[in-house]
Amino acid sequence: MRYNSFLSVLALFNVLLWFTFILAISMTFSAINLLMSKKFTMKNVQPTRLDWFFVLLPYVIGLFFAIFDSATIGQVFFWGA
């Protein structure tokens, strides 16, 4: 019984990682689209806390992997960048 609950937690974690991956890709494409638009000017950009959250999210996820010995710090910074 305990084995099945562990697999359920792993499956949920896998779904959350895929959701985060898809969200990061869509936000990257949105940012590229914004940067390529002619209306974009740097003086109008005021990053919010939510912006910083999504920018730092890959590093936070990578640090969790590093804490549990699944990744090294070098891998965290490589995949976060």
UniProtKB/Swiss-Prot annotation:
It is found in: Membrane. Its main location: membrane. Residues 1-31 form the signal peptide. Keywords: Membrane, Signal, Transmembrane, Transmembrane helix. GO terms for cellular component: membrane. The chain crosses the membrane at residues 52-74. This is Uncharacterized protein PM0415.
